Amino acid sequence: MKSVYFFDTYEFTRWFDDRLLWDYVPGDNTTVPDRPCIGKSRPIAGDNANLVLLNLDKVRHFVFLKDDIPFRAKRDKAIFQLDINYKPHRRRFMERYFGSPICDAGIIAPRPEYPSEWTKPRIGLYDHLSYKFILAIEGNDVATNLKWIMSSNSVAVMPRPTYETWFMEGRLIPDYHYIEIKADYSDLEERLHYYIAHPERAETIIANAHRYVCLLYTSPSPRD
């Protein structure tokens, strides 16, 4: 078990007899086991009750930002800066939107099979906050950046999620907590132009996202 997983689970396991064992499924969980287990993530669809979620790897997944830039003062663009290695759905996004005037798309891990111009210098989390919209595209399971986006004054833009963590992404409401786009990303520009023209609606989504994030500070228990 990774040390971060050990310390995150010890917060709860320390209250139990050390002789007791628990069933843990490590890593990015994209399937549900046939027995009750503890894990970091699980599919949203179907019967997922056998995979009980604990707040694991929180140093990476549960990062929140203080954003002092009002939405209307940000750039009228979206940003996509993620690793696309072994993630064909993210590669399709790059193929479609690299060079788009409304989306600053780039990758942070170059590989020979990708066009060299796709690679852009890695920027810090706070540098993303100059953009009104930030893409939250799922990776191996969830979109890791979704939590800090929803704590900011920018709006998360993504297809409907298919995986969830302790953050309970499956309970997020499209166009209420985030801007939903189609799974093939084909309506991205249309959706961005709409919210640029209607900033008050984007600000309502931001307020709803902030309220959702605040729930994390009052719900420390495992999710089932």
Where are these regions (language model features)?
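Conserved small/polar residues in nucleotide/adenosyl-binding loops
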Residues: 217-224
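Secondary-structure boundary motif
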Residues: 98-99, 197, 215
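C-terminal "capping" alpha-helix adjacent to the active site of nucleotide-linked donor transferases
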Residues: 182-200
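Nucleotide-sugar donor-binding catalytic core of glycosyltransferases
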Residues: 1-181, 191-193
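A short, well-ordered alpha-helix in the C-terminal region of glycosyltransferases
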Residues: 201-215
